């Protein structure tokens, strides 16, 4: 089972934070019902675990934490760090088990790593459990942005798009509507197969942030996927190029759009030429330039560029290029 892999530094910081937390809790022994002697033993093993970790001695740190577990088997924090350490030494099933125990002992605080393990498992059954966990956590922590974001991701992992949008609504109440909110909603609608709503979400955000280049790029992507009218796509490409006149993909795609819709071929050639000057071995750019030359009757020059495009093309790029190649080279 795949679990988030922690670096040594991350584990150390977690231990240090936990150790400081325990040291600072004067009522800790009373809270857990431990005697002073047992509390001292517990702290001794926590410090020993930290020292072992300082020297990258994971096995020794693990042994010390297991003593802590024996002294207080109901301590969720100990269970969570045992999960982290078992993961560090590649004992994934034990790691998952301890993270699960930590969550069950303290669901309001020990849900994050357990949720990450469930999410990364890639297993449908575990993803269903993740959604149940996420729903429980937001009831326990209704003002926690991370908890609502976890529910959003859990819902998406289960293809529950309605729940994902509800979680995003709650996130927006907590932190306001912004670019991240718009992007999250856009992705949900795309995943749900609702391109019109995805486009509407992008346009909603652009209404308040009209200079955001990335969202204009999102807009034209969804327009092309929807086979939107030529003039609509053209207007979006023009806006993109106003914001970034040297955006190569936009130059190439706008040039090709003009070519296949009977637009201004001189303008298309000029834009396409700029892309191959910047990236002379880019198969996609070469293909576009060759096709525009062909449409203008310049097949001799077009042949040179389409041959170069085919030589440089990756396997997944070849289908469209081969079609153009056969037409330009007049092959059957």
Report the location of each language-model feature.
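N-terminal leader/linker segments that initiate helical-solenoid repeat arrays
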Residues: 16, 22-81, 88, 329-332
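Start-of-helix register in tetratricopeptide repeats
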Residues: 43, 77, 111-112, 146, ...
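Residue-level recognition of tetratricopeptide repeat
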Residues: 50, 84, 118-119, 153, ...
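Structural signature of tandem alpha-helical TPR/SEL1-like repeats
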Residues: 55-63, 89-98, 122-135, 158-167, ...
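Conserved structural position within tetratricopeptide repeats
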Residues: 67-70, 101-104, 135-139, 169-173, ...
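Canonical tetratricopeptide repeat
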Residues: 81, 115-116, 150, 184, ...
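Alpha-helical adaptor scaffolds
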Residues: 115-118, 220-225, 248-277
């Amino acid at each position: 089972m795949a679990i988030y892999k922690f670096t040594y530094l991350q584990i150390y910081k977690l231990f240090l934070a936990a150790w400081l937390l325990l040291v600072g809790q004067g009522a800790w022994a009373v809270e857990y019902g431990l005697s002073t002697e047992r509390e001292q033993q517990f702290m001794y093993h926590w410090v020993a675990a930290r020292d072992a970790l300082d020297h990258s001695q994971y096995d020794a740190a693990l042994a010390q934490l297991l003593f802590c577990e024996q002294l207080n088997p109901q301590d969720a924090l100990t269970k969570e760090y045992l999960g982290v350490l078992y993961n560090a030494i590649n004992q994934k099933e034990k790691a998952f088990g301890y993270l699960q125990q930590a969550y069950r002992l303290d669901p309001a605080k020990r849900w994050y790593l357990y949720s990450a393990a469930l999410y990364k498992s890639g297993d449908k059954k575990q993803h269903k459990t993740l959604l149940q966990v996420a729903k429980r956590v937001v009831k326990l922590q209704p003002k926690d942005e991370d908890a609502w974001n976890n529910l959003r991701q859990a819902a998406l992992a289960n293809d529950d798009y309605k729940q994902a949008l509800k979680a995003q609504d709650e996130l927006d109440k907590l932190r306001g509507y912004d670019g991240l909110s718009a992007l999250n909603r856009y992705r949900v609608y795309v995943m749900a197969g609702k391109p019109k709503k995805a486009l509407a979400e992008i346009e909603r955000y652009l209404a308040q942030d009209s200079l955001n280049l990335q969202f204009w790029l999102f807009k034209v992507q969804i327009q092309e996927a929807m086979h939107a009218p030529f003039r609509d796509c053209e207007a979006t490409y023009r806006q993109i190029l106003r914001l970034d006149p040297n955006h190569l993909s936009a130059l190439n795609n706008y040039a090709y759009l003009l070519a296949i819709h009977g637009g201004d071929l001189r303008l298309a050639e000029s834009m396409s030429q700029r892309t191959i000057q910047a990236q002379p071995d880019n198969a996609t750019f070469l293909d576009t330039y060759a096709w525009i030359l062909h449409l203008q009757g310049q097949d001799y020059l077009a042949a040179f560029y389409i041959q170069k495009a085919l030589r440089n093309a990756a396997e997944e790029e070849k289908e469209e290029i081969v079609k153009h190649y056969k037409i330009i080279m007049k092959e059957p």
